């Protein structure tokens, strides 16, 4: 789960001149970026011109080489304190989450997923559709789950968010807080 205190005083710096998709954390070679790159290439020129893709954290050089050839604005931000990373999340239009393309990846639940949920921004997940991370996103009522290679669906999702056709997030993020989850676990243990 996420720590509610991390979001208490976080700054929001929305930049209306850009449509911001952010990835927060390490992007190593196991994280399949090709689906996202193909989706960005399929976006309309209007969206591509307003698009800012922001990576906060370490990015594998091979992925940077692919991304830098996209012809859109890309920003690489090295390691920042967690509070600053939270501000980047809150200042984004879409948060990109990629599950590593490795065997037995359906059970991967990253801490980043819960922080993204707490940020209450649209999440675009690329990974196993039947995996645990996808199930959490689906339980929140979000539509942003895409299998590796589903670039057309991902591109369509990005366009819908850009055009405000997908906007309202009506889930209660507290169900994914560390405090709530710890309370639930303690009740199970006590019973």
Task: Please provide the spans of the model-predicted regions.
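A charged, aromatic-enriched C-terminal amphipathic alpha-helix characteristic of glycosyltransferases
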Residues: 149-155, 162-190
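Conserved donor-binding/catalytic core segment of Leloir-type glycosyltransferases
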Residues: 13-31, 37-40, 181
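Carbohydrate-associated surface elements
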Residues: 1-2
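Nucleotide-activated donor-binding/catalytic signature segment of Leloir-type glycosyltransferases, i.e.
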Residues: 18, 47-50, 54-57, 62-87, ...
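Conserved donor-binding loops in enzymes that form glycosidic bonds
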Residues: 23-28, 58, 78-79, 175
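Nucleotide-sugar-dependent
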Residues: 31, 81-88, 95-117, 123-135
